[in-house]
């Protein structure tokens, strides 16, 4: 895995955004069970501080979720790593992300060499994310739409990653998953959620596995500008 040169240049930080601080975060993730070195290396390289408000930059490499406005958050790095590790186990080439948010998870996936399609229902967040993608030289296909309907034009996907919680897994998204593909999503209520891994096996069957308890914002229908 080789990140774009422009991304590596932008990744240089100082003080609480320095490489030393990022290395500490990566070691914490490793201690907390993240094993895929490709994922850890990508988290070390991708500059999380550029995906949040400048006022929060000093907290960028804490292992915690942070607000990005509009009632949304940039996910905790451990959660990003865990979800990414889960989808990477099926060696995907093309992935659909539901909920672009800040664009950080999208950037992680693209920097791993995946062909990324991402959908965001809040127009302002998507415009900000697109600007970051351009600045970092990352190629990501994005769409302003209701994420719960997926993106059928480019289906099927080897992996689907959902970054907001619904009460159940969404059939429309499962239908867009390729044979041998994997969907990872938080499922549950506002007070109780779990990260669920769904795999469509080679013979076409569906298997489910509960990975971890998590807390995500709710997956909402419709679109906002």
Swiss-Prot record:
It catalyses: [protein]-L-isoaspartate + S-adenosyl-L-methionine = [protein]-L-isoaspartate alpha-methyl ester + S-adenosyl-L-homocysteine. GO terms for biological process: methylation; protein modification process; protein repair. It comes from the Bacteria. Its EC number is 2.1.1.77. GO terms for cellular component: cytoplasm. It is an enzyme of class 2 (transferase). The active site is at 75. It is found in: Cytoplasm. The keyword Disulfide bond does not apply. GO terms for molecular function: protein-L-isoaspartate (D-aspartate) O-methyltransferase activity. InterPro entries: PCMT, SAM-dependent_MTases_sf. Keywords: Cytoplasm, Methyltransferase, S-adenosyl-L-methionine, Transferase. PROSITE patterns: PCMT. The keyword Transferase applies. Belongs to the methyltransferase superfamily. L-isoaspartyl/D-aspartyl protein methyltransferase family. Catalyzes the methyl esterification of L-isoaspartyl residues in peptides and proteins that result from spontaneous decomposition of normal L-aspartyl and L-asparaginyl residues. It plays a role in the repair and/or degradation of damaged proteins. This is Protein-L-isoaspartate O-methyltransferase. The gene is pcm.
């Amino acid at each position: 895995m080789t990140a774009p040169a422009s991304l590596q240049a932008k990744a240089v930080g100082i003080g609480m955004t320095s490489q030393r601080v990022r290395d500490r975060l990566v070691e914490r993730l490793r201690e907390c069970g993240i094993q895929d070195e490709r994922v850890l290396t990508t988290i070390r390289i991708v500059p999380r501080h550029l995906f949040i408000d400048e006022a929060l930059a000093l907290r960028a490499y804490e292992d915690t979720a942070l607000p990005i406005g509009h009632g949304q958050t940039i996910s905790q790095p451990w959660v990003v790593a865990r979800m990414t590790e889960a989808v990477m186990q099926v060696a995907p080439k093309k992935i659909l992300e539901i909920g672009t948010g800040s664009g950080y998870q999208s950037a992680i996936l693209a920097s791993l060499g995946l062909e990324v399609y991402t959908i965001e229902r809040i127009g302002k967040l998507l415009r900000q994310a697109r600007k970051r993608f351009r600045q970092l030289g990352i190629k990501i296909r994005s769409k302003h739409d209701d994420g719960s309907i997926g993106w059928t034009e480019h289906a099927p996907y080897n992996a689907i990653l959902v970054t907001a919680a619904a009460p159940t897994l969404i059939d429309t998204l499962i239908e867009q998953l390729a044979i041998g593909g994997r969907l990872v999503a938080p499922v549950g209520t506002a007070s109780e959620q779990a990260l669920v891994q769904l795999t469509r096996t080679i013979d076409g069957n569906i298997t489910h596995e509960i990975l971890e308890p998590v807390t995500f914002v709710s997956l909402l229908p419709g679109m906002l500008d």
